């Protein structure tokens, strides 16, 4: 059993800055290495670990979430059986390491090398939590769905751009320009349809995901986008099992803002949530106000009480979240209660 080392990785598109910290001192001279962010670079990481006398069973890696840039490194770490943890960039930004007199450079210098040392010190401070709850890549189906739903959003955004141009500028454009824009919009709609078809194929290949998808789509207003998005974010309701926790994650849970005698901000939703999921829930809520009798009655009742529209809409979003988690917990499709009241 070798000594325990805490290794921080600053991930970028081209390379990885890697530094280790032993919990006592920072080895400025030999404690850092830069490698390419590809397979050849990962082999260099293994050689570097051997050079500094680190046992792979005694090292703890830590890195920030950087999307696709850290995907290959995470796969390599899991193949090698190395424990690692992922940290939010917001947490790293607020992290204040306990620095000695010879480590003050970490406070003053902003480079990739210094960032890797800061991440290593964060890893040491939170090592117990990382070892008890190590990060793992989700199943390949979630990764495929995540990329497909991102592709669909790009097509929808481009289509909205051209639609706005046709509406606002068609009177000033030539006939050829209008024709080309309409052709592009037609092509984008076709790509959206093809992307959705591929999403459905990926969903149908996994029985557990397919079951959850069908249950979610039984809820009024919930379609392919919101159902798939919820399955991805919760990893099919295994990573997040509590509806209140999910509401907090997407930013629809009200939070208090108070300090002393002067600051009394009241309850407001946080801006730190996953805003895309929050926006998609807004679309579902507006649909439910028009189509769902219970939601419509709730909206009218609260409006009559003088409640602000945004507050009511946020409450409806939470009702939809509760419905999604309820159908998964009960493993039964959603049933509209009003249909049995006649």
What are these regions, as identified by a protein language model?
Residues 62-73:
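Acidic, metal-coordinating catalytic cores used for nucleic-acid/nucleotide bond scission
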Residues 75, 85-215:
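Long, charge-rich intrinsically disordered scaffolds of nucleic-acid metabolism proteins
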Residues 1-23, 119:
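Gly/Thr-rich phosphate-binding beta-strand-loop-beta motif of the actin/hexokinase/Hsp70
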Residues 13, 67, 91, 232:
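Short, glycine/acidic-enriched loop or turn micro-motifs at the edges of active sites
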Residues 224, 230-305, 309:
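Phosphate-backbone recognition surface of nucleic-acid-processing proteins
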Residues 261-262, 299-342:
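Low-complexity, acidic/Ser/Thr- and charged residue-rich accessory regions of DNA metabolism proteins
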Residues 25-56, 60:
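Nucleic-acid-processing active sites and adjacent nucleic-acid-binding tracks
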């Amino acid at each position: 059993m070798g000594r325990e080392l805490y290794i921080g990785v600053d991930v970028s598109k081209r390379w990885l800055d890697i530094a280790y910290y032993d919990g006592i001192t920072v080895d400025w001279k030999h404690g850092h290495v830069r490698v390419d962010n590809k397979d050849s670079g990962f082999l260099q990481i293994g050689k570097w670990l051997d050079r500094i006398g680190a046992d792979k069973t005694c090292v703890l890696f830590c890195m920030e979430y950087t999307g696709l840039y850290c995907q290959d490194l995470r796969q390599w770490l899991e193949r090698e059986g190395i424990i690692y943890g992922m940290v939010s960039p917001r947490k790293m930004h607020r992290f204040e390491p306990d620095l000695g007199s010879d480590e003050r450079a970490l406070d003053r210098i902003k480079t990739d090398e210094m960032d890797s040392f800061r991440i290593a010190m964060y890893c040491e401070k939170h090592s117990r939590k990382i070892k008890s709850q190590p990060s793992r890549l989700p199943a390949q189906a979630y990764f495929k769905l995540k990329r497909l739903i991102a592709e669909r959003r790009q097509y929808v955004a481009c289509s909205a751009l051209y639609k706005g141009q046709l509406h606002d500028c068609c009177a000033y454009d030539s006939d050829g320009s209008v024709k080309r824009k309409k052709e592009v919009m037609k092509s984008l709609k076709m790509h959206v349809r093809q992307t959705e078809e591929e999403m459905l194929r990926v969903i149908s290949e996994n029985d557990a995901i397919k079951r959850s998808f069908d249950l979610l789509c039984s809820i009024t207003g919930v379609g392919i986008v919101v159902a798939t998005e919820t399955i991805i974010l919760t990893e099919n309701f295994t990573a997040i099992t509590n509806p209140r926790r999910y509401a907090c994650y997407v930013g629809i849970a009200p939070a208090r803002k108070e300090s002393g005698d002067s600051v009394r901000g009241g309850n407001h939703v946080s801006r730190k949530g996953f805003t895309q999921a929050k926006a998609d829930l807004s679309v579902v809520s507006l649909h439910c106000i028009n189509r769902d009798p219970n939601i419509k009655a709730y909206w009218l009742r609260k409006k009559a009480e003088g409640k602000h529209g945004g507050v009511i809409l946020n409450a409806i979003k939470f009702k939809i979240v509760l419905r999604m988690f309820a159908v998964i917990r009960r493993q039964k499709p959603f049933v509209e209660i009003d249909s049995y009241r006649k």
